[in-house]
């Protein structure tokens, strides 16, 4: 998910670069520059997700091996993984919102890039939800599970409307 999210934000930066300094877009330069800065931060964070994901997964795999002796370790590791994936989902939704903002002011010649960005960002939201669901299977805390599931269902509905 991190790779797709970083690629999406790089593509947003590409669109911004092809909008900034263009005569037909002089009146939206400040907005496009802000979008580019936000996308750059999200891209950097997403690149870190790639490395962090393996650490989170290793913790879950280690806990899974000892789950019979120490079930609380699997619960903790699974919750950590759920929270990690939830944060990635939130960043994916932020990216989708950035694309939506940029689509209103960005270079019209890049219509296909806007559509690709939206598909990638929505895919990142959906992929994060898949990861959340898989890890929720190992969480016993029903209140935690319900809170997380309600959150991602709400966010997914929001994402599909963009």
Where are the predicted features?
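Conserved phosphate/anionic-ligand binding catalytic regions in large, soluble enzymes, centered on
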Residues: 1-13, 110-128
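Amphipathic alpha-helix face/heptad-repeat signature
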Residues: 3-7, 35, 42-49, 81-91, ...
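Inter-helical turn/loop segments and adjacent helix faces that build the functional surface
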Residues: 19-26, 102-111, 135-147
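A structural-propensity feature for long, helix-poor, extended segments
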Residues: 20-62
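Amphipathic alpha-helical interface segments
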Residues: 53-123, 135
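Long amphipathic all-alpha helical oligomerization modules
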Residues: 122-161
């Amino acid at each position: 998910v991190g790779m797709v999210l970083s690629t999406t934000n790089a593509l947003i930066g590409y669109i911004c670069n092809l909008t900034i300094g263009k005569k037909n877009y002089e009146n939206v330069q400040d907005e496009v520059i802000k979008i580019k800065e936000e996308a750059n931060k999200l891209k950097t964070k997403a690149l870190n997700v790639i490395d962090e994901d393996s650490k989170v997964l290793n913790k879950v795999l280690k806990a899974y091996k000892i789950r019979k002796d120490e079930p609380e370790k699997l619960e903790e590791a699974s919750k950590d993984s759920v929270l990690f994936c939830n944060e990635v989902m939130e960043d994916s939704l932020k990216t989708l919102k950035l694309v939506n903002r940029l689509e209103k002011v960005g270079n019209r010649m890049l219509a296909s890039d806007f559509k690709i960005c939206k598909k990638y960002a929505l895919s990142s939201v959906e992929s994060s939800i898949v990861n959340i669901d898989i890890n929720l299977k190992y969480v016993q805390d029903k209140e935690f599970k319900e809170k997380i599931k309600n959150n991602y269902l709400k966010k997914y509905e929001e994402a599909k409307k963009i």
